[in-house]
Amino acid sequence: PDTFSTKMVRFATRSPDGSAVVFESLGKLFIKKGDERPVRLTEHDTGFEYYPVWTPDGRQLVYMHWHDDALASLKSIDLKQGKSRSLLEAKGHYIEPSISSDGEHLVYRKLSGGRLRHGAFGERPGLYLLNLKSGENSFLRRDGADAHFVGDDIYFTDRKRPTGRNSDTAKTVLFAMDVTGNSVREIANGLLATQFRVSPNKRWVAFREHYQVFVSPMQQTGKSVPLGPKVKSLPTKKLSVNGGIYLNWSNENSLSWSTGPEMTTVTLGDAPFTEESATETINLSMQVETAKPSGTLALTHARIITMNAERDVIESGTIIVTDNRIEAVGASDEVEVPLGAQIVDAKGKTIIPGIIDAHAHGRYGEGEIIVENNWNTLAHLALGVTTQHNPSSSAKLAFASAEYTNTGQILSTRIFSTGEIVYGAKSRSFAPVDSVEDALSHIRRLKAQGAISIKNYNQPRREQRQQVIEAARQENMFVVAEGGSLYHMDMNLVVDGSTGIEHNVPALKMYNDVTQLWQATNVGYTPTLVVTYGGLTSEDYYYQQYNVWEHPILSNFVPPSVLRPRSVRRVMAPESEFRDDDAAAVAKTLMDNGVTVNIGAHGQREGLASHWEMWSFVRGGMSPMQALSAATINPATYLGMDADLGSIEPGKLADLVVLTKNPLENIEYSDDVSHVMINGRFYRADTLAEQVTGDRPAPKLWWR
């Protein structure tokens, strides 16, 4: 669509008097007052703005301004005058600022260097205190996160892990300390809690567990008080319906949280555990334009592997692209190039549809910082992966990155995701499901944030997995299921109506009982050969076959510190030890029986592994055309996107890969990429500098 409504609103925080809300969307901070439309907070035209926090008087906001080169700087802005000033400019990675009640001090967390972020300027990470009057900057402690002032104390959280053989399991602990970093004491703890927030009057403590928001009375007994929805020693009230993030108190008794674009505020009365509390919900979504080019481009005289229903191959063909969609495709002597169109002579080249990776875990940010140039997604794009579906990710990062991409804030693949998995194991990611209603709560939360799919991940009982499937059906979402290397569970998941099975079925052969059953369903199969169960994987195999660290495209984008360790110090083993070709042969059997089989590179090796998936499918018996189908039209169909993606046909989005050689002759030519087109924009593969359709320069990466 030409426009869309933003969903992944982040950092939403009410002003102290409750009259306004500040939030981040598309990398910029906005303020919304009452029913008025949101307005930009600053006039920064470069970089991204994160972590807004109000001063106690509500007259100023402190925030972090991010540049990939300059890194983080902490700034404040006077809301009346609209003027910004820098509070901390020393190069570093700063997040989570919080201001003292007297407005004189700022506590923040410094991160060490990152992988997507610059690897340096992270010396002595931890919690710091900045005196806003004198500018004195003091180190408080190494451990701790989510620090926030309450009165004269700083509260923060940390994980307390077992130290002895018979010790308790790890807990999330709420600590308090004074402004010097001393007098540290434990206040509360939760086995599965992910966030604590203390109210300004120290009467309440809000916490997040199982993705839901709870509140309990604050107890300062000198001992750590256990908190949780099932703890009986203190009254606890569940406040959210479909979960929430970004917990914040705006005054003594008003707690806010976000679920997608909606911000909910609950005002606790004198008896919140026996009476209903006043609740207000506002929608912070904005209608924004999708970025796309304008004009017409003709790619002429190329071999075109269309991946249409007939799998037509045009030996000397022309593709006409207008704006961001394919207008015409056919033999060059039959397709008329419009007057005024820009022309790219692709003689000798082969063009395939953009590769769609159906199971692509990826890094979209660190510490909720989405970088301007993400070498991970850029490497995927340079190698022809134009669409990624991530079946397990951080919703706050994946869906925000998708919106940044759709509006042209960053250059990236198309990003789709499940967000967080609906996980059945006891952990801080635990998503308990004991009814369809429980499943609906998780699914509605993820859908509100931007999910198109749900990851049904190791719920232990079959009825629980069925409840997730039924809830997803009610919400018109599709369900990808973690196979978990359990054959019988895989068969249950097929019979119960999952959209697809992720990871290979742990069997060396597939017989008629399974193929006849599976072909009677619409369940797809994404075996993720790069992480094959049962033996050495395709990733191991291709490290053995090639000097991957020397790949001319991959090595241009992936830092040597990331690329070289696994690829240089590689496993060497006899051919018989590898199981990716055996798993591929099983997938071939299913494909021959009508099952939709897809590539899914698991986020391994930054785009090149998507090609390894195809190569291993051919090693397992597929033809190159079948392997290309598994990388293009099959996943497009599987993900419900085949009306727009997956083949080179009129009306579809212009996502194309220009290859220097013909992969139908040798599938291992598929990674010899010359150019990539995504959404109608044309880029050199080796640098991702835009050509012909615009002049966007090659992305600048921190490590080179």
List PLM regions with ranges:
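Histidine-rich, glycine-flanked metal-binding segment
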Residues: E310-I352
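Divalent-metal coordination cores built from histidine and acidic residues
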Residues: A346-G365, E372-S485, T499, N512-P559, ...
